[in-house]
Amino acid sequence: LQFKLLREDIQVESVETYDLSSSKQTVSYVRIKNFQIDTSRELRNKLGSLNMVDGVILDLRNNPGGLLEEAIRVSDLFLPGKKRIVSTKGTVVSSVHDAKQLFAGDHLLNIPLVLLINRGSASAAEIVAAALKQNERAIVIGEQSFGKGTVQTLWDLKDGSGLKLTIGE
């Protein structure tokens, strides 16, 4: 038997949303599975019509993390400008990231926000949880998170493999 396979890009959404409604109020439930390229844009697009909701539940349970930049952008959606999101300390590079209001509009800044975490919430998910809690923007509910608190980068090697290196904490 011979097969001819065609390789295609598979787009996996990192954000799921749906509304929880009662006769008195509507709350949007948002699950972020991981922080990959465009997670913040995907979240913003899905929450674009929040005028009719009374609150948001942001579920980061079992979220292993992902891209630091996307964690910063997701946090930025819910924080007014000049609020500290994260600062990293590395042996080579240290940096500070404050909210910049990267996306137009402020409808997400005043909506009540509850954040869910558990022991499976790590890395970028912990950064979002800490930023929103420390800036008194969200109530965090759940278990202690994984406790990773590190920033890693992936280096592509010539043989097609990769090396994941911790570059900050």
Where are these regions (language model features)?
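Cleft-lining beta-strand/loop regions that shape enzyme active-site pockets
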Residues: L1-K158
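Extracytoplasmic/periplasmic membrane-proximal domains and adjacent transmembrane bundles
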Residues: L154-W155, L165-E169
